[in-house]
Amino acid sequence: IDALTFYPLNKHTSPEDISGYLQPLVGGASMGVISEAGCPAVADPGADVVAIAQRKKLKVVPLVGPSSIILSVMASGFNGQSFAFHGYLPIEPGERAKKLKTLEQRVYAENQTQLFIETPYRNHKMIEDILQNCRPQTKLCIAANITCEGEFIQTRTVKDWKGHIPELSKIPCIFLLYK
């Protein structure tokens, strides 16, 4: 690992910096994108690296690894034939409530599982917003720390979650809605 070079990558990394990071790849070296949590390039700044690499016509090879999106669908008991991942929902309360109601409508209208994530320190607020804005009979799966020690994956109705919110601050979570 000492022979490796690591570059910082976050929402503040400029396209110019990313292009510079890709110079070894342009020169024929192999490179990889890793993520501290989640799947690189899916709701992740790694997508910017891949987009620039594609524009430069560089070879991009995705590697198989655990994906909280697929694993949470598998463990939820929800529709795995039709699902949609929405990444991060709006932070502003009114916009978030509107988005949650829209996703819930899609559950019932399209028979489609709806998935989304939140920054770990806002997990509790997300759960509160789901419980406040979704129908009591709508099912919510909370999948946290997937593939890690302390993994937590449970599916209950919104009504059954009320009064039983787990402590999930600072833990990566994915939330799924279904009927």
Regions found by a protein language model. Name each.
Residues 1, 50-51, 76-81, 133-134, ...:
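Short, hinge-like loop/turn segments at secondary-structure boundaries
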Residues 35, 60-65, 116, 142:
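General beta-strand structural signal in soluble alpha/beta enzymes
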Residues 12-17, 91-94, 122, 147-151:
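A short acidic, often aromatic-flanked loop/helix-cap motif at beta-alpha or helix-coil junctions
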Residues 3-6, 26-30, 108-179:
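A contiguous loop/helix-start segment that scaffolds small-molecule binding in enzyme catalytic cores
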Residues 38-41, 68, 121-122:
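Gly/Ser/Thr-rich loops at beta-strand to alpha-helix junctions
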Residues 19, 44, 72-74, 95-98, ...:
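Short, well-ordered secondary-structure micro-motifs
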Residues 1-59:
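Class I S-adenosyl-L-methionine
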Residues 44, 48-106:
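Class I SAM-dependent methyltransferase SAM-binding "motif I" and its flanking Rossmann-like core
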